[in-house]
Amino acid sequence: MKDYKENKSNLSETFCNEVYSVVREIPAGSVTTYGDIAALLGMPQYSRMVGRALRQVPAGLNLPCHRVVNAIGRLVPGWDEQRRLLDAEDVSFRKNGCVDLRLHRWR
């Protein structure tokens, strides 16, 4: 896709907006991973940058960030609301507390 050779510590507005566009598409009851989003953008090595972009979502953007989990379905540590929001969308969890990606993974 695009070539983001710039310093990874400085997220470009373009990169963030592309991440936000993908997150907007995740339907209720589904989740995706940081790595899946990075791969969709053509930059599979940028999964951590996807996470950084989601940590700085502008107020009022109303993105369903709660639908993004790590590669094994683990939720964001310390963000209790994420579990509540996913429960409300009937997302199921395994015994270890991770989202059941076999049932709910969106690509």
What is each residue range found by the language model?
Residues 2-107:
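Nucleic acid-binding interface residues in structured DNA/RNA-binding domains
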